[in-house]
Each structure stands twice: as C-alpha cells, then as structure tokens.
C-alpha cells in the first residue's frame, strides 16, 4: 500500500478547530498564538470555501469557543460547532455529519488544544477512519511546551502530517494564478506582521 503524500485541495479538505475555549485562556502555553493562527486559517478557509468544524469540550464547565474565533465565522462558508465529552473530536455525531455532508472529505486540518490530549486522540481516530490528518504545529498547544512537542512527534509516528499554517495556506492555493490568491495574500501578510509585532504569538519551535 502506497502511503499518502498528503497533498491537499480545498474541495476535499476541512478545518477542525479543537476546543479553543475561554476557560483555557490562562492555562495553555501561548494560548494567544493558537487563537491568532487559527483566526488567519479561518479567514483563508472562508475565502476558499473550506468547511470549518469547531468542537467544544464540556462547554458547561469550560466555556464556549473563544469569542475572537466565533467572530471570524462567515455566512458564505459552512461552519458547525459540536459539543462533546469525549476527548477526541472524532465522535459519532461528527463522523455522521462528515458522511452526510462531506462525502468527498479526504484531508483534515487541525488546530487547537491540548496537543497531547484532544488533538492527539482526534488525530489517531481520524487516521483510523481513513482520513489524512494535517497538524498545524504553530496552531496547537498544551499546558506546557514539552507535552506539545512530544505529542507532535507521537502523531508523526502514527502517520499524521506535521506542518505549519503558512505551508497549508499555500498548499490550498497552489498557484499564483488561483482566483483567490489576491484575497489571500493580504491575510498572509497581516499574519506575518502580527508575528513580527508580537513574537510571543509564535509557536514555531518544534
């Protein structure tokens, strides 16, 4: 069996944003960086009509998705929020939604928290269900960076693709003649400017 090369196109991709909830804000390593990268990834996905799926871990106790991300939702793009108690995003409800509404889905792009718990378990479950999984390493985090780094390597060992937000953005557009290229360039420029203005937002170290 030939291992997937991990190529992605908008038509068969979806962005999964894992449990970026208000109660975690003061407990996650570089939480604001995770929010910032996820925000720009959402803007690109909205432009390319890549569906976005949020999960919320026990929102009754942990709060709902961080407001800055909810503001990025676009009525012209598909967005869905699933509540869960399972650590994995790959719940029966989510799988049924994918089978009914995204039958051509191949590539799952993941941002969120915590890398070594919900992101890791989601990745293993989605891989087991036959999806390619791409972890945006600069858009996932944990309570501490060591757990984050070990989890990234653990997911790589299991067959996930460890990548970055910017790399995914340019994979999705692929060609400078893409019809959305001129709309996406300012998004990537603003993202870079944010990282220069506030280096604390960067989670680039792996």
Swiss-Prot record:
SUPFAM superfamilies: Isochorismatase-like hydrolases. Pfam families: Isochorismatase. It comes from the Eukaryota. CDD domains: YcaC_related. Belongs to the isochorismatase family. This is Isochorismatase family protein 1B. The lineage of its organism: Eukaryota, Amoebozoa, Evosea, Eumycetozoa, Dictyostelia.
């Amino acid at each position: 069996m030939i291992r997937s090369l991990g190529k992605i196109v908008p038509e068969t991709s979806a962005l999964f944003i894992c449990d970026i909830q208000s109660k975690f804000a003061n407990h996650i390593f570089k939480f604001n960086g995770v929010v910032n990268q996820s925000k720009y990834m959402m803007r690109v996905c909205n432009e390319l009509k890549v569906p976005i799926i949020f999960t919320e871990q026990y929102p009754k106790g942990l709060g709902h998705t961080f407001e800055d991300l909810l503001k990025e939702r676009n009525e012209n793009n598909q967005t869905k929020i699933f509540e869960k108690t399972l650590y994995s995003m790959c719940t029966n409800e989510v799988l049924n939604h994918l089978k009914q509404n995204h039958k051509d889905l191949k590539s799952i792009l993941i941002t969120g928290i915590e890398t070594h718990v919900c992101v890791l378990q989601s990745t293993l479950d989605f891989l087991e269900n036959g999806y390619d999984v791409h972890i945006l390493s600069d858009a996932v985090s944990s309570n501490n960076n060591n757990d984050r780094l070990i989890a990234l390597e653990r997911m790589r060992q299991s067959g996930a693709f460890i990548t970055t937000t910017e790399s995914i953005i340019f994979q999705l557009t692929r060609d400078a003649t893409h019809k959305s290229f001129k709309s996406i360039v300012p998004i990537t420029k603003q993202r870079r400017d944010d990282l220069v203005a506030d280096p604390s937002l960067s989670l680039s170290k792996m």
